[in-house]
C-alpha cells in the first residue's frame, strides 16, 4: 500500500495581532521592507529574503506564545487539582462553602 506524501504548511496565526506592540512592529518592518525593495537592484531576491526572515520571526513568536499559554494552563490545572483535593478532604457541608 502506497503512502501519500503529506505537505505541512505553516499558517500565520492571527493571535499575535491582538498585541499592539506586535502590530506596530509589523507596520514599521513593512515600511522598511518597502523602502529596501524600492532601492534594491534585485527586488525579487530582497523580497524572498525578507519574506523568509519574517516568516521565521512569526514562527518563533507563535512558538513562544504557545509555550507561555501551555505553562499558564499547566499552573491552572495544578492549582485546580490542589483545590479539588482540599475540597474532598474537608468534612461537612459548611466547609464546602469555602470552595
From Swiss-Prot:
Keyword Signal in the entry? The reply is yes
Keyword Signal in the entry? The reply is: yes
| Cellular location(s) | Secreted; Host nucleus; Host cytoplasm
Output the Gene Ontology cellular-component terms.
extracellular region; host cell cytoplasm; host cell nucleus
Q: Which keywords does this chain's UniProt record carry?
A: Host cytoplasm, Host nucleus, Secreted, Signal, Virulence
Residue numbers covered by motif RxLR-dEER = 35-55
| Predominant cellular place of this UniProt entry's protein | secreted
Q: List the disulfide bonds.
A: none
* Role description: Secreted effector that completely suppresses the host cell death induced by cell death-inducing proteins.
What family, per the record? Belongs to the RxLR effector family.
Written domain comment of the UniProt record: The RxLR-dEER motif acts to carry the protein into the host cell cytoplasm through binding to cell surface phosphatidylinositol-3-phosphate.
Under what name is this protein listed? Answer: Secreted RxLR effector protein 94
List the source organism: Plasmopara viticola (Downy mildew of grapevine)
Q: Gene that codes for this?
A: RXLR94
Amino acid at each position: 500500500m502506497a503512502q501519500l506524501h503529506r505537505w505541512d504548511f505553516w499558517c500565520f496565526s492571527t493571535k499575535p495581532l491582538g498585541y499592539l506592540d506586535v502590530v506596530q512592529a509589523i507596520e514599521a518592518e513593512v515600511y522598511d521592507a518597502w523602502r529596501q525593495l524600492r532601492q534594491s537592484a534585485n527586488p525579487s531576491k530582497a523580497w524572498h529574503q525578507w519574506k523568509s526572515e519574517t516568516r521565521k520571526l512569526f514562527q518563533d513568536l507563535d512558538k513562544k506564545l504557545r509555550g507561555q499559554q501551555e505553562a499558564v494552563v499547566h499552573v491552572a490545572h495544578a492549582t485546580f487539582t490542589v483545590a479539588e483535593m482540599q475540597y474532598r478532604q474537608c468534612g461537612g457541608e459548611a466547609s464546602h462553602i469555602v470552595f
